[in-house]
Amino acid sequence: MPEIWLKYGGTHIVLDIKFENLLKHISSNLNLSSDAQVRAKLSGVVLKENTLILATDGSISVARAIEMILDLNRSIDLSKVSIETFSKYVGTLRANISNKACSIERIGSEPFDVMIKKFQKILIISHTKHDPLFGYCGAPTMLLRNFYPDKMTEAFNSRVTNLPAPGIAGPPLEIALSVFSELRAEVIEVVGNSYGISAIFHDNIIEAFDSALGYLSAITETKEISSGSTIICTSNEEGPHETLSSSLNSLWNSIHLVKRNGSAVLLAENTQGIGNGALRDCVEGRIELQNCLGGQTYVEGQEHLLYLRELQLQYDLGIMSTIPQYYLNGKLGLYPYTGSKEILNRLMEKHGRNHKILVISDADNILIKSNAEEN
């Protein structure tokens, strides 16, 4: 009996699954660069004493890039370099940066174009990943989400499907790129995971993002046969998945591998609860799950409600989380599991004792596409 350990918040849980019931265990296998290689890539990043380092993510990879850049620029007064990130990433970024002398501040509420005029230089550092709405996530999409609500609404309404579309660059991404095509700022796109950095791309916002997408697609996209059920584990980093809102992309990025009427189970501890935005509005009764198609002003995480609504018609969606069952099942329609044994037992009862289960670890950093014969 294979013993599979899966990340669950700040700990790991064991999945005691019989060999004959395991279709495959897939995890990201990024080729990591050495510190010397990363430093060489970053050696051309020159800071000035009135520089804003804007981190669009709090991941370990982004934190490591920031630390190396600061170390390479010790000749200037680093106290005059501002490091800012979005409020939901402040705690995570602070925890991931080992140099506690670094001051990580929350980005203010002023418009983006007003904020950047205060600084002599702007350096944006982003973590390139897959995204179910935009296809890919990076500096253009994160800036659009957080600074341009009207354009974000336009991007959401421009989608060509109500289903997740990770790895597909469509109209929403085109809108994001068009908004920042003239942005005069240096951008670093990082491809990596909790173990290190795989690649660094330093250029203007469009070129850096485009290069990162090409690299990400080449190393993380693979093919696998579809399965009747899939157990999905979020990334090996605890911080980025403290809320349900920040965890669901792992489910959306993998759901296409599940056969119709099959089961998908997400493992996400969610120590900080539901999160803000549309999911919270839904569980608190301010928005209905059935009223999420768009048209009105976009609400953060609105795509989660859209995907829940659409995919519950096709799949049995479940989650193992610390969030109360009343919210998970009663409000969002997710079947709540209490442990890995219950997950396996229910999947076997539903699909048969000879059923084979696909297990995906680190779903943030891998995009698995169905083989053509299974589509």
Please give the residue ranges for each predicted region.
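N-terminal amphipathic/basic leader segments beginning at the initiator methionine
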Residues: 1-36
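Short acidic-hydrophobic, aromatic-tinged amphipathic segments that line or gate anion-handling sites
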Residues: 29-37, 100-109, 204-207, 334-343
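Glycine-rich phosphate/diphosphate-binding loops that line cofactor/substrate pockets in enzymes
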Residues: 36-54, 73-78, 222-230, 257-259, ...
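Short glycine-rich or small-residue beta-strand-to-loop segments that form or flank ligand, phosphate
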Residues: 49-62, 82-85, 232-234
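Anionic-ligand anchoring segments at beta-strand to alpha-helix junctions in alpha/beta enzyme folds, i.e.
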Residues: 52-54, 68-100
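Histidine-anchored nucleotide/phosphate-binding helix
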Residues: 58-80, 247-258, 264-265
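Conserved, well-structured core segments that form the ligand-binding/active-site neighborhood
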Residues: 101-236, 242, 250
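C-terminal non-catalytic interaction/assembly regions of soluble proteins
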Residues: 247, 252, 256-375
